[in-house]
């Protein structure tokens, strides 16, 4: 009988990182951030948006599971999105 499963050759641990992303542009920017994280394949455990009328800044608080290599480029990657002001651990 043949074994049809392929053993995993590499395994990279992921660490849950809680982040706050500050942005301008209201709900549209919040949705773009969520879409970008989804398109890049980041596992997002929770995603909370705080958008208030008349306030120039909005924020996303989220928990993202990242490898150490992904963590090194995550802030840079999100920083390329228009309207992202900062990405900080919380």
Indicate where each model-derived feature is located:
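Long, contiguous binding/interaction regions
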Residues: 1-58, 63-90
